[in-house]
Amino acid sequence: MSRCGRGDFLLTYQDLLAVGEDEKARMDFIWRSINEHEGSKAYQVAADAELYFKGENPTINRYEKIIYDMQGRAHKDMYTANHKIASSFFGFDVRQEVSYLLGNGVTFQDDATKDRLGKKFDLEMVRAGKYALVAGVAFGFWNLDHLEVFKLREFVPLYDEENGALMAGIRFWQVEKDKPLRATLYEVDGYTDYIRRKGEDMTVLKEKRPYVLRLRTSQADGTEIYDGQNYPSFPIVPLKNGDDALSELTGKRNTVDALDLCTSNMVNNVDEGNLIYWVLTNCGGMDDLDDSKFLDKVRTSHIAHAGSDGDEGATAEPRTIEAPFQGTEATIDMLKRKLYEDFQAFDSSAVSAGNQTATAIAASYTPLDLKVDDFEASVTEFILGILALAGIDDEPSYTRSKIINKSEETQTILMGADYYDDEYITKKLLTINGDADQYDELMKRKQAEEMERVEQNPDFPQQEENEVTEDGETGPGAPVDG
């Protein structure tokens, strides 16, 4: 039995438990879950939001101009211009917010943490941030030694009815409608792969296996699985956009539609109004066919007979129509300003002048800072969940990407140099110049120069070296091939 959640009738973790271990019943449950998920409001919002993110507008694309005949019957307007111009503002806003928070990567207190999370951790975090802002939620799967990210449109979450925790989920994908449907059921005690080919029932592709597999290889037996284990909790963590997990487009979609519709109407008016029409004089006895023939002759021969002296012959005078522009332009400018306010986006044109002070620039970032502060809390909660699964005790921090007055910021750092150590000053100056990723290489070169000075001058005082020890890591395992 389905239960209501946030306006959608979705299946829950308790529904999965009620199915039991019968594979036929579990496959029916998976098929039903996917169908209900694709028909849910959250899925439809995510699908539309992805189109807005890509620079399309599904609302105006579905809109058709209608005209009515003398009997009052509606017909599709096939005559007037119907340009449909979509803006990319939503995509710009999402990319700006993600880049602002995660553009410089995630920093940890222990340098070894990044290595244990995998080389692509920062890239996966950027992907997760985009998915979460677009659809309202994304899902991160810790797969032994690296992070994998699922979007809402490919993952059915199964929440616990009692505490709201994510306890199971179904990832599904299908290249085309006539291609096989693949699905993976993730549970606390392992995962199972399924496949549903065209015209066939769903079958088990791979039996349930634990998430961490221990492998051994020998010449006689080759590679074999000799042991397996699971994580202390469900290995998929949701990244929500706020407590309600709402798309960033929620509440602002109508304004985006208004801007796109207004822009489209202006182009349509120009298309329709940028015409030359003819005023025919002394043609009262001519019908529509005569008018067309007369104008065709004027266009081809460029001659119009006006009659003899005192005789009022037929004449043709060309005129033009100018489309209204100023009023529409003012409306478009107003809607753009409203979008920046509603989305709390940073408008770089406000600080485009080269003489902006650091205080003025910082003030321009206030709306974006307020919005990103909320999203940062969600990102931090997500990362802490991943760290717990990986068995890492650490905390993340972030360096936000800002437009700054470099000379003023540099002077501020150097004025306080007596109160900071070399490491802090070096990191700050590199960050200001956009070279924060060069810190490790710079420190290696400085250490090499230090050693060279010591070798050339034996009396030069050497710095004490402290031995750093690291905890031993667990034995090798095999990641899930999801």
Stretches with model-predicted labels:
Residues D291, L295-D309, Q326-A330, M334-G482:
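C-terminal helix-loop subdomains that flank or include functional centers
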Residues G129-N241:
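Extended, regular secondary-structure scaffolds
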Residues M1-R3, T255-D271, T281-D287, M451-G482:
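Glycine- and charge-rich intrinsically disordered segments
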Residues K114-D122, K130, L246-V256, E329, ...:
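Generic detection of long, well-ordered alpha-helical segments
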Residues D93, L101-G105, G313-E322, A448-E449:
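Short glycine/proline-rich turn/loop motifs
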Residues S218-Q356, A363:
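Extended, charged amphipathic alpha-helical segments
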Residues M1-L147, D471-G482:
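Extended, helix-rich architectural segments
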Residues H37, K41, E124, A132-F139, ...:
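Short secondary-structure junctions and interdomain/linker hinges
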